[in-house]
Regions:
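Hydrophobic h-region of N-terminal signal peptides that target proteins for export
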Residues: 1-8
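Polar, low-complexity export/assembly segments characteristic of proteins
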Residues: 11-115
Length: 115
């Protein structure tokens, strides 16, 4: 499994993050993310992924989990290009870091990039 990991004490911040997924889940598992606004409290997001889910469906599952957990007054969460998720701060909100904490979903690679 490929994963882009960053550490809390050195996490860069950005106004928008892209999460790219590739592959099909070979077994049911969970993906755990942490979003931390600059000088703010972290929000952990855990996403359950069922076996057999392709990258586009994994992206939708992750989008839905972030949308349910994050305030719509502070962030927008959308699917982009089918297999990518974009998380953007709204105007007036602080930049934030995004990190992959853990994943036990086999055969799904996850890449996180600030934009």
């Amino acid at each position: 499994m490929l994963a882009a990991l960053s550490f809390a004490d050195a996490s860069p911040t950005a106004n928008k993050w892209r999460i790219e997924f590739d592959g099909q889940a070979l077994k049911t598992g969970e993906i755990q993310f942490r979003l931390t606004p600059r000088q703010g409290e972290p929000t952990d997001v855990t996403v359950s992924i069922r076996s057999g889910r392709a990258e586009n469906n994994v992206a939708k599952d992750v989008r839905d989990a972030f949308a349910a957990k994050l305030s719509p007054e502070r962030y927008t969460v959308e699917v982009d290009d089918g297999e990518d998720i974009l998380i953007k701060k709204k105007e007036g909100q602080p930049d934030f870091s995004l990190e992959l904490v853990d994943s036990d979903v086999q055969n799904v690679s996850i890449k996180i990039e600030g934009e």
